[in-house]
Each structure stands twice: as structure tokens, then as C-alpha cells.
Amino acid sequence: MKNICTIQAGEKAYAIIKDEGLQKERIKCMLGAAGGPKWIILYGLDKVLYKAFLKKRKNSVYMIGSSIATWRFAALSLADGLQGIEAFKERYFAQQYSMQPDRHEITAETVAILEAFLPDSKVDEIVKHPTQRLCIITARSRHLLQYDNTFSLGVGLGINAVTNIFSRKLVGLHFDRYAFYDAREFPSLIQWKSYHTQYIPLNNNNLKTAVLASGSIPLVMNGVVFQHDGKTHILRDGGLVDYQQDLPLEPGDYIALYPHYSDRIIPGWFDKPLKYRKPYHALENVCMVSPSKEAIASLRYKKIPDRKDFYTFAGDDSRRLLFWNETVALGQQIAEEFMELVESGRIKDRVIPFKR
């Protein structure tokens, strides 16, 4: 199958790629979206991008993500990022649950996945990585959403969903953005103005807490307790505030590389059913690589993996793994096609302007 990857770029990134192709030195940051198992289609891309654009860099690169992207980027930011992402993938695929798991069981299994690729002994590798600067987005819960009981969370999320129909800015009534960043280099290229944003330097004591919090889905997992400024906060999935990284990036002669599982950017968690909700911010520096619609249609269920797979294949992990491994194989083909375009320079001909 040919033409299985789609490459879209904003005005500045498009001009750069048309002129010189995609060069390592031009990449100032990598972006990653929330989305649970959807990331599996990107596993192959993560590996080739690490080898081509992250390994043996001279200048630093921000790794900015929420939810599952935080986990991918944490794995890639270990001393051996290739081994890190492979260890994460292996334990992620191996997760198992009872027929009706509660949030305590799911939280415990998620912690086990985290420990498998990021034990305490490896945290320092991320904190002191010579070039990769991890930025972890989490959501601090407010009002009813601070409590881990089904009623409070259900009502709070319902109110959030309704207010979001009128304006995405109203999500800020329910969540604050807590952004954990590399203490050596503030992520000044992100010019956040929506919601209240609290910036917290990463260290050996809070990094794993931030990674876990960024993927803690409300109603599915327990909120993560975080002590800051003498107060106790409940942090949840970063996708609640920044689902697919519609970020206000500063202008400049750089590229924000975005391996994504979709050719559409959905700004917020509650925007998923809102087909009219478009990215708010300029995407001029973004180059987004995603599977083509034809590639996704070639999979046996005509879709990429998602969280529903745990219910669809409950009690039958062999069928789930068959589908997931098939997706990995397709993702590898996408990765190989993308790198051939980069290395040959033909990316200049394949890149297209963003569809808005």
C-alpha cells in the first residue's frame, strides 16, 4: 500500500519543508495528543523519529504532551529512548483486567505499567536528559471534580460538557492547567492564555506523579493527590484541558513536529462530538504526520485501537492483541514511508497545507 501517511503543515512549517525538507535542527518541539490506545498506530513513528530526530541532537527539544503522549514522551526521554518506548509498549499490551474492573483495579494496573518502564532508578535519566525537555500537561480538578465518587464526578463532567458547547474557555471553570516542565528550560514557546496555568518544575520526586496524573481518566481511574504550596490538589488526565495540543506557539523559524493518529486536531476532551469545533490557535509552525484514511480503512475493524477495545475484547485478550499487533505492523509501514520521504527529499512534494 502506498501513500499511507498524510503530512500537513502550517504556513511557516510548509514554507520551510518546501524549501529544505525536514531537518533535525529545525525541530524545536514535538507534540503529542491524548487518546489512550490510539497511540498504537504511532509506535513505529515514535521509534523512527527518535532515531532520526531525537538521538544525538546538539540543541534541545521540548516534548510536550498530555495523557498517553506524556507516557510515550517519558519513555522516549530515557537515556535509551528506543529501549524505553519498547518496554512501555510491551507492558502496555500486556495489561489485563477482570470482566468488570473498577477504578481501583485499573489504577493499580496503570501504576504497574508505569513501574515497568520507569522505575525510580531511571527517573534521573529524564530529569537530566542532555537535550530532551519533557513538558507534562495535567488538569487540576475544581469543585465537584475534586471528589472520586461516581455521583460528584458524573455531575461535574456533565456540567463541563454542557458549558463547553457554548465556549471551550468555560472548561476553566472546572479545571486548571498544571504544566510540569523541565526545570532547566522554561517552555517559553507556549504562550498559554486560556485557563489558569500553574507551572511546576519537574524533579525526581514529582515526575512519576505527573506522568501518572496526566493519564488518570476521571471515572475510570483515581485522581492523583499532589501536594503543592502547602495545599492538596487532585490532578487528572491532561487531555481534559489540552486533548490534541491546539497550542499557542510563539512564531519563529522552527518546526513543531506532531506525530498524530488523526488528520484532525480536536482542541479539548469535550470537543470530540463537536464536529464544528476547530483549533483556536495558529498552526503555522506545526508539521503533523498521521495515517491516511485509506490506511486506517485497511485495518480489520476499519479503525485504530481505542479504549472501547477493553470492553469489546473483555475476557479475550488474544483477539485484542491480534488487532493491536496488526495496527503496529501498519504503523511500521507508515513510519517507513515517512522516513523514505524525508531521506529522499520527496517530503517537499507530499506535504500539504493544513485543512482548517
Language-model regions: role of each:
Residues 67:
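Catalytic nucleophile serine of serine hydrolases
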Residues 1-62, 75-356:
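Patatin-like phospholipase
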